[in-house]
Amino acid sequence: MNGYVDFSPSPTSPTQEPGEPQPTQAVLQEDVDMSSGSSGNENCSTGRDSQGSDCDDSGKELRMLVESSNTHPSPDDTFRLMMTEAEHNPSTSGCSSEQSAKADAHKELIRTLRELKVHLPADKKAKGKASTLATLKYALRSVKQVKANEEYYQLLMSSESQPCSVDVPSYTMEQVEGITSEYIVKNSDMFAVAVSLVSGKILYISNQVAPIFHCKKDAFSDAKFVEFLAPHDVSVFHSYTTPYKLPPWSVSSGLDSFTQECMEEKSFFCRVSVGKHHENEIRYQPFRMTPYLVKVQEQKGAASQLCCLLLAERVHSGYEAPRIPPEKRIFTTTHTPNCLFQDVDERAVPLLGYLPQDLIETPVLVQLHPSDRPLMLAIHKKILQASGQPFDYSPIRFRTRNGEYITLDTSWSSFINPWSRKISFIIGRHKVRVGPLNEDVFAASPCPEEKTPHPSVQELTEQIHRLLMQPVPHSGSSGYGSLGSNGSHEHLMSQTSSSDSNGQEESHWRRSGIFKTSGKSQSKSHFSPESGGQKEASVAEMQSSPPAQVRSVTTMERDSSGASLPKASFPEELTYKSQPPCSYQQISCLDSVIRYLESCNEAATLKRKCEFPANIPSRKATVSPGLHSGEAARSSKVTSHTEVSAHLSSLALPGKAESVVSLTSQCSYSSTIVHVGDKKPQPELETVEDVASGPESQDDAAGGLSQEKGSLQKLGLTKEVLAAHTQREEQGFLQRFREVSRLGALQAHCQNYLQERSRAPASDRGLRNASGIESSWKKTGKNRKLKSKRVKTRDSSESTGSGGPVSHRPPLVGLNATAWSPSDTSQSSCPSAPFPAPVPAYPLPVFPAPGIVSTPGTVVAPPAAAHTGFTMPVVPMGTQPEFAVQPLPFAAPLAPVMAFMLPSYPFPPATPNLPQAFFPSQPHFPAHPTLASEITPASQAEFPSRTSMLRQPCACPVTPPAGTVALGRASPPLFQSRGSSPLQLNLLQLEEAPESSTGAAGTLGTTGTAASGLDCTSGASRDRQPKAPPTCSEPSDTQNSDAISTSSDLLNLLLGEDLCSATGSALSRSGASATSDSLGSSSLGCDTSRSGAGSSDTSHTSKYFGSIDSSENNHKAKMITDTEESEQFIKYVLQDPIWLLMANTDDNIMMTYQLPSRDLQAVLKEDQEKLKLLQRSQPHFTEGQRRELREVHPWVHTGGLPTAIDVTGCVYCESEEKGNLCLPYEEDSPSLGLCDTSEAKEEESGQLANPRKEAQT
């Protein structure tokens, strides 16, 4: 009947069930109202059921029911009818009383059916009419749901055993009334109710409920609260009142703003009704409810039970008084690609009339005006094109609950899955432009809702779904929280710049402007439509910028006259421009990358191995010659500080000739950044530039942070408190990043160093000729010409830039040549000079290369007043096997002389004399017994007759004057040219802080290109011959060596390693090489036996500096400049060999970054134990996954490695005949104890691992 004819009644069909519930109004109301199964307009019964034909139909159906009952009587039905009659008509007068009982039962049944039909939801009605069968089915299902809910409550409380009741406050009924009255007394539309979580009954309800529902308070006594809820909202009420989800009432005490926000977030919406406002209509009113967990005692002395205390506030239409202001009529929605509502903002409730649960999981298109539905296809096409960027679109009309339409101004965006690059959901931001005609949006709709969507709606939904299943194309930004890369175009810039420092800076300069533009475009509005276009335009502009500008700047730099544009001008411009602020995640991510690269030896050596001399000319003249020394130092400091902290080499370009952290080269490092989202407009590429650009940019950075804070507020973050906290965290991290900047102390010490040098008298600087110094710093052009004549192999020592010509800046003693440019170390035409030192200095001959002597126009330091009592042998051209001893006085100490200096130790009164056997023009001086050593010739083939002459002891007076201390300051500033890693910079910082030797000697050994050699051709060929590593060490600036360099045999290994990364143009056993090798061996007092080294020792210290892991030194090491501490050194001077002296020295005297030696096996054992502990928390493959892997990869089953990567040879050795460029690093084949295979391979590559292992023991 009425669409339900096909339903065949079962023995338990509703035809036999209507008497099951007691025919009283309360029980019927309980049976129906407690239902949660309907999802329609349960509150909009219009009373049609009681009119005309519907009443007739009900009467007919009821007569059929009664006849059926009489025809097929059942004992239960007869008994129930008799009991009902007995209750209502207690007469026992035989047959008449029985007839009257049937009549009364018939009337009661009709009333009950009518009551049930009122509660039947609209979607359950057939053709707008409520049939009796459908009504009885709905009543039966409601009864079952009520029973299930009661069982659920009991099961929930028993299973939980009330775990959260420990800290729950307990109140009596009077106390509950007292604590709730202060919140509800101010609002007449608010009431409080306490519902038992055990029985579901109302234990307490405030008096305000009577005027709100226009009923007596007794109507709620001994009743379940869900009886008054709309059936569709019962499940919502249960989900939000689960005990473990409820906050205790104590959190509401005080009610500050933050707690109030939390209270609002915990709230939910339900419709409540007490009874019928009209005879045939139940009208529900929407309430916003905030639940809390309390314990309530019903009676004194009784056990308290857990209750849900609800603060319920009625929600009014946003268009009725008090109206929501038009500018605040904004809400947001999200829907899935198949156009189903996923989330609805609670602000939509008073504007649309729907509760959130009414719209979620319902089609979006159904709620739109039929004429506006086709617009959604165009909107979603643009959503796909925008790639997550917000944009505005034309207004649409949205239907409210009362059936009216409101006009919305919409903005759309989307969230893109970063893995699949597909749209996960669409975000809509809507503002009401035109309100409804009927301002009561909660009123019932006069027209019934569509039960099934229109076919056009279904077709349109399918089109949109197919459209959004396409992957989103990559663009400048990827929308809300997606992980697309904003810096992907950086690799193009890196390739066009060819590692030229100015090219990189120019590209960096262009990037800064572009990113400022994009930042402004994004910060204008949260939904700015043109921001995506500007971003794409900026990327296109960057990619189309010609590399000719880079090449032109590089060409200017290659002019040896020094008249090119100073490189420091670019970073200074960047410094004074306002930099975009960086997020906490970006800076911390970049800092992690920097620290990783600093500690990665393999990355450093790979970079040096891939470097070619062709890139050298791009690193000249960081300071214009016209600049004052102070300005030059300042600009150099700014440049270096910026670059060391921020610029990293691109890991994606292995062929780039940059070091790990290069001082004067600006490199792209976008490939090393883990992108953390595009919520902030500025990319990660400028992360640390404003942090490390010096004190000038701190104000700008602070201003940028304040601007960003303002922009964040405009962007409309969800919580202002969270935004403010985020800004504070960013600023704090930024400040800490400045404080721990690795060049902070270096800048200060360099500034003091320059100031002291400027105050030092000219007499303290020795007999130097300024022109000679200048010439030595201007010899870059000739050195490059000489380099072009030599075989060019991979070079690491020339990866950093050199300083421009600055007056009174001789090379620094003890620095490795690779830390300096050829202009610093290529003093090939300048002979070596002595340097007074508390331990013997050994000036050895320099053999000038033929190119330097014969080439006209070479700038050579002119001889000046002869240094007292000193001569220097110089080998003329063509005299290779013999020493030609001839005096060569000169003013400036420029040649590679090695001396061991102690901090602040005064110099001897006169220069030490050289052995007569080696320098016939000089007298003998007695040899110190503890410092006797032997010096081997540079090459037995080269000097067969001079071996015995070199084995001479040397000593030095120990009564030095104090007047020559200022010579320790005669070195070039730190930022003219530096090494290839922050570790080397720290070591250089520690070298220059004490007033140690700098003036009387150049570097430890010049580069092979500039070092005076015997024959270019033969030297280059000999350099390729594999030779045994020299067993000598470099004792210069011993206070700067760590524990690894305390013994000569360890440094022998380090120097042997250096053969692998020596400069390709190094001459075999050049004078400078002989100097550093021989002196290193002699000063340490170790007897050496060498077969000759085929490379310049200039890169020994480069390898030493560059390969030390950052964990082996303390970045915060304090320089020992105090005189009292340095005086403690005097008692140890010249008493023992240096290794014994260092072993017996107190810890407070030794450098703080030295680490005690550790047993390698013990360290590995500890690491293996830690790894075993960590293995439990590591992810493991399941058996199914392992089976799949074995099927695909057979090598998994064997437990070994695939043949493609199972390489046992040295991957860094290109050829044994081409220089044996292997990298003996333990890090190359780490033994983690994970399998025996790696350990076996480590043993196989013995020469790779053994030197480093022995060094660490």
Curated annotation (Swiss-Prot):
Q: Could you tell me the keywords of this UniProt record? A: Acetylation, Biological rhythms, Cytoplasm, Nucleus, Phosphoprotein, Repeat, Transcription, Transcription regulation, Ubl conjugation
Q: Where is this motif: Nuclear export signal 3?
A: 983-990
Where do we find the motif LXXLL here? 306-310, 1051-1055
Which GO terms of the molecular function aspect are on file? DNA-binding transcription factor binding; histone deacetylase binding; histone methyltransferase binding; identical protein binding; kinase binding; nuclear receptor binding; pre-mRNA binding; RNA polymerase binding
Induction record: In eye, brain, heart, lung, spleen, liver, pancreas and kidney, expression exhibits a circadian rhythm in the presence of light/dark cycles.
Q: Decide whether keyword Nucleotide-binding is in the record.
A: no
Q: Does the keyword Membrane apply?
A: no
**Region span, Important for protein stability:** 478-482
Q: How is it modified after translation?
A: Acetylated. Deacetylated by SIRT1, resulting in decreased protein stability. Deacetylated by SIRT6, preventing its degradation by the proteasome, resulting in increased protein stability.
Main location per UniProt? nucleus
Residue ranges constituting the PAC domain according to the UniProt record: 393-436
Q: Identify residues that carry Phosphoserine.
A: 525, 528, 531, 538, 544, 659, 693, 697, 706, 758, 763, 939, 971, 1126
Chain spans, region CRY binding domain: 1157-1257
Compositional bias ranges of the Basic residues kind: 779-792
Q: Where is this motif: Nuclear localization signal?
A: 778-794
Positions where Phosphothreonine occurs in the chain: 554, 858, 964
Cellular component GO terms, alphabetical: Cry-Per complex; cytoplasm; cytosol; nucleoplasm; nucleus; perinuclear region of cytoplasm
Q: Which domain of life is it from?
A: Eukaryota
Q: Which Gene3D superfamilies would you find in this protein's record?
A: PAS domain (3.30.450.20)
Q: Where is this motif: Nuclear export signal 2?
A: 460-469
* General function of this protein: Transcriptional repressor which forms a core component of the circadian clock. The circadian clock, an internal time-keeping system, regulates various physiological processes through the generation of approximately 24 hour circadian rhythms in gene expression, which are translated into rhythms in metabolism and behavior. It is derived from the Latin roots 'circa' (about) and 'diem' (day) and acts as an important regulator of a wide array of physiological functions including metabolism, sleep, body temperature, blood pressure, endocrine, immune, cardiovascular, and renal function.
Q: How does it assemble?
A: Homodimer. Component of the circadian core oscillator, which includes the CRY proteins, CLOCK or NPAS2, BMAL1 or BMAL2, CSNK1D and/or CSNK1E, TIMELESS, and the PER proteins. Interacts with CLOCK-BMAL1 (off DNA). Interacts directly with PER1 and PER3, and through a C-terminal domain, with CRY1 and CRY2. Interacts (via PAS 2 domain) with TIMELESS. Interacts with NFIL3. Different large complexes have been identified with different repressive functions. The core of PER complexes is composed of at least PER1, PER2, PER3, CRY1, CRY2, CSNK1D and/or CSNK1E.
Q: What is this protein called?
A: Period circadian protein homolog 2
Report the gene name. Answer: Per2
